[in-house]
């Protein structure tokens, strides 16, 4: 049976930590920022850990992990 492929979109958007958490960037940062509060823009920086159930789904799409 051939090797399973990792979804390209998952490679670009997510990282898996050493403890197995799936990290992703925050959304709502592309346009319309003038209407958003400074606090919202500040808290959307960086990355966040996905909820456990979403992380399981992402791991299914990356059968051999992500670098």
Curated annotation (Swiss-Prot):
Any single Gene Ontology cellular-component annotation: cytosolic large ribosomal subunit
Keywords in alphabetical order: Ribonucleoprotein, Ribosomal protein
Entry-linked InterPro entries: Ribosomal_bL35, Ribosomal_bL35-like, Ribosomal_bL35_CS, Ribosomal_bL35_sf
GO process terms (BP): translation
GO molecular function: structural constituent of ribosome
Family statement drawn from the similarity comment of this UniProt entry: Belongs to the bacterial ribosomal protein bL35 family.
Protein name in UniProt: Large ribosomal subunit protein bL35
């Amino acid at each position: 049976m051939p090797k399973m492929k990792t979804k390209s979109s998952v490679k670009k958007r997510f990282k898996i930590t050493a403890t197995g958490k799936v990290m992703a960037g925050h959304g709502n940062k592309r346009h319309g920022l003038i209407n958003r509060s400074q606090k919202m823009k500040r808290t959307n920086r960086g990355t966040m850990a996905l909820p456990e159930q979403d992380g399981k789904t992402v791991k299914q799409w990356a059968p051999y992990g992500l670098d």
